[in-house]
Every structure is written in C-alpha cells, then in structure tokens.
C-alpha cells in the first residue's frame, strides 16, 4: 500500500465516523421531539406545575340526630380528621352543612330504597389520587378505630359514600384570591348521578366545552371539578366551588341558565338520575372560614 493510499483510507474512515455521528445525532434529535419527550416526562416522576395535586376525592353524605351532634362534630373535627390527614397521600379535608333542604322536583332522583338518603352533611376528603383510598380502604380505616370512634361513626344516618377520581377541572376567577390551596372552598354545590350510557359522551362534552368554562368565568367561582366514581352508587359527580355563599347565590343559577350540559344547545339533564336529595349546596363548617 502506497503512502497516498494510506492517506486516502484514513480520510475515508474519518468521513464515515463523522457522518455516522451526525446521523446518530439526527435520530436523537427526532426522539427528543417525539416519543422520548414522553419517556423523559415519565422518567422524571414529577407532576407538571399545572396538573392538580389532589385527583382523588372521598365524598360522604349523611344526616345526624339532634342528640349527641355536638359531641360528634367535636370528635370529627378535633380527632378523626386530623389523624386521617396524617396518612400518606391524604391532602385535605372539608366538612360542610347543606343549606338547601328541599328536593328539586325538576330533576329525576333514584327511587331504589337501597341507596342511602343522607344529605344534611357533606364530608369531602382530598387525596393524591383515588388509589390512596384502596390501601387501606375507608372501611378498613374505620374498622380499626377505637370503640369510641366507631360509636361516633355509628351516629351517621343514611350514610352514602363515593370514592372518586377527577376527570376534568377548570380554575375560576376567584381562584387567584383563594389563599387555601386545594382545600375545598367556603361554599360548594355537589351533585352525584348516573347517566344512560348513550348520553355519556354528550354529557362529558357538555361539561368540558360549555358548563365548566362558563362557571369558571363567574366572578365568585374558585374551581369546578368533574369526577367519576371508583366506588359508590353514583358513576358521575360535579363539584362547583365558590368563594362565598353570597357569590354562589349571585352567580350559580344565572350561569347555568346559559350553559346547558350537552351539545348544540341540547341538555342531557332530563336523562340523569340523581342521588337522593341532591344536588346539595353547602357551606363549610370545618376548617372554619376566615372572616373577610
């Protein structure tokens, strides 16, 4: 081999090495803007800043007898809920007293006597996700309570439970001034219901495209959450959160009137089967609402 041939061979080898590196770089660039972006996000194991941290909701509706009510409320607020919030994945708890006591005659309510009818109190517990409520399950937590705690829970009348996962959320105008983070707002309206399967897609579209944006455009709305059930009678729920009772009374009905749950002006509400005595408008009794 001549000196000239050796130089030519070396130049060709360097060219192939450079070209190969460029090709690998091109492939890596393609992956970085395609599938590997998703892999990177997954491998980081961190939640996006705009993604809600409390996707799980444990909702309980119930009534209480007059006798022993104050003792029960003291136990719930001072003992049971603070202990519950020390568990991994549990983020917040809010206890509400229902303000509307008349059942709406324009809605279809379930007639099955097996579905509990409590509604005067609503207890909401937020968690990282609905899987938190599977280990341990609420029934396991409550069975492990000391005797006094089990006696307190036994005071609940018509108790109905749903364990839910959030499927859609809209943050409202009042969210910027809401200083309590994910904690349930001072005033809520919560509805739980079932829907014939042939209307479920339209219902979802109606909430996401129409109702949620409209409600979150109201001045007193903190946030609105559409939820689906992991356990419990109702397959669906909607949670509207407001900065105050006065704001709810001003904004809720007028907003609903112009935001039907459906497509092209159609409403699926007549097809829904609501939980007993629902939906429920309620104000928070714990944690206490700070005075303005």
Predicted regions and their residues:
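N-terminal secretory signal peptides
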Residues: 1-14, 36
């Amino acid at each position: 081999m001549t000196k000239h041939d050796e130089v030519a061979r070396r130049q060709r080898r360097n060219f192939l090495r450079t070209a190969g590196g460029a090709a690998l770089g091109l492939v890596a660039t393609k992956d970085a803007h395609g599938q590997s972006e998703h892999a990177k996000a997954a491998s980081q194991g961190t939640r996006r800043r705009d993604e809600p941290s409390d996707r799980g909701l444990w909702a309980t509706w119930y009534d209480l007898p007059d006798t022993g009510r104050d003792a029960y409320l003291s136990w719930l607020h001072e003992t049971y809920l603070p202990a519950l919030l020390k568990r991994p994945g549990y983020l917040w708890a809010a206890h509400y007293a229902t303000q509307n006591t008349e059942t709406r005659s324009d809605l279809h309510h379930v007639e099955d006597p097996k579905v509990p009818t409590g509604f005067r109190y609503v207890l909401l517990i937020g968690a990282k996700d609905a899987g938190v409520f599977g280990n341990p399950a609420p029934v396991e937590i409550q069975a492990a309570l000391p005797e006094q705690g089990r006696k307190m829970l036994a005071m609940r009348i018509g108790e109905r439970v749903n364990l839910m996962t959030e499927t859609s959320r809209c943050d409202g105008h009042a969210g910027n001034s809401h200083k309590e983070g994910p904690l349930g707002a001072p005033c809520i309206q919560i509805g739980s219901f079932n829907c014939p399967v042939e209307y479920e897609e339209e219902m979802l579209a109606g909430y996401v495209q129409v109702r949620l944006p409209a409600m979150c455009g109201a001045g007193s709305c903190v946030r609105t959450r559409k939820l689906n059930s992991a356990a419990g009678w109702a397959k669906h729920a909607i949670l509207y959160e407001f900065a105050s009772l006065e704001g709810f009374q001003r904004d809720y009905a007028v907003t609903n009137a112009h935001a039907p749950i459906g497509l092209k002006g159609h409403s699926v509400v007549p097809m829904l089967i609501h939980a007993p005595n629902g939906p429920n408008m309620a104000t928070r009794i714990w944690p206490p609402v700070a005075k303005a």
